Amino acid sequence: MLSDRIEHKWIEAFADVIRRCGVRQGDPAAILSETQSRQLNVQLTELALLRLGARPFHLVVPTPANPHPVPVRSTGASEAIGGLAPVVSACVAAGFVIDLTLEGLMHAPETPAILKGGARILAISNEHPEALERLAPDDRLAERVRNAARRLRGTREMRVTSPHGTDLTARMEGASTVGIWGWTEKPGTLAHWPGGLVVSFPRAGSVDGTLVLAPGDANLTFKRYVESPVRLTIAADYVTALDGHGVDARLMRDYLAAWGDRDAYAVSHVGFGMNPRARYEALSMYGQRDTNGTELRAVAGNFLFSTGANEFAGRHTAGHFDLPVMGTTIALDGEVVVRDGALLDVF
């Protein structure tokens, strides 16, 4: 059990990542949060900015009512701003925004306007600072993620296989690829911490095959390791069958059906983790209140498969699964980059 107490080491960890974002003495910085945000991280962010001589100010919005039929977790599509133009304007005027909303701004509807206005956004995931401290980014991680993103942008086909029966193909031409290493200093861009992964959003009709979730894989929407096999059949991006007899399959079937939205069954993104500091067992070490599961997304060599929104394929939905799949082999145009769950030294 961790205590929500400010620690000097966490101020320093936050300051190091913020410094990497190009924040200098006297720079304004907007701290965007909502009433249900993790207050320890809000306080650490303010103290870290002051430690760097920046001039922080707070934008705090009420956490909105959940308009959906089920709890929403790990979507990356915060609804906290709610279209409030003054909040968007303040973010643009600040030039640098630290996002501490529960779900994050990555896919929020207001984010394009903030980025188009020239602001840069550091989204700090809703993790306990103990995890954030362990997952501090570094230059080597950034270099490898950049290299992997360039490789994926030039890839025509990703194929993923496993001994459990996974055989999935994603046609990558026209996909939008994002490399996330944990900070951004470039205006008009967004990064999130923890980082250490690369993901691609394929264009419509690009993903087909079978994905088998085996015991030990993870479902981060439910913050649990998979205990019994789940077999997903995917045709032209959509999950057309979800087979399995255990609680994992039932949870997934019920959650997807609750949305009443076909796009909740569609592929959001595909990619893989690259962070050697991210630990597979971490999900078992924290209570659900203290983790958002971001660490497992970044575990080196995991195949990160997600369902739900893909704006690059014209699909918008709040239903979302992030599924780190362990032990797969990932090939890009026939070149293996992950073998049996181990990231190869090719980036």
What is each PLM-predicted segment?
Residues Y225, A241-G308:
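Dual-mode signal for accessory low-complexity, basic/Gly-rich regions
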Residues M1-S228, A235, R250, D261, ...:
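Active-site bordering "gate/hinge" segments
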Residues M106, S176, Y238, P276, ...:
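Short loop/turn segments at secondary-structure transitions that flank enzyme active sites
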Residues R289-F347:
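Internal helix-turn-beta structural module
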Residues F14, F57, F96, F201, ...:
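Phenylalanine-focused residue identity feature
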Residues S33, L213-P215, I234-A236, D243-G246, ...:
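Active-site proximal loops enriched in glycine and acidic residues that flank catalytic Cys/His/Asp
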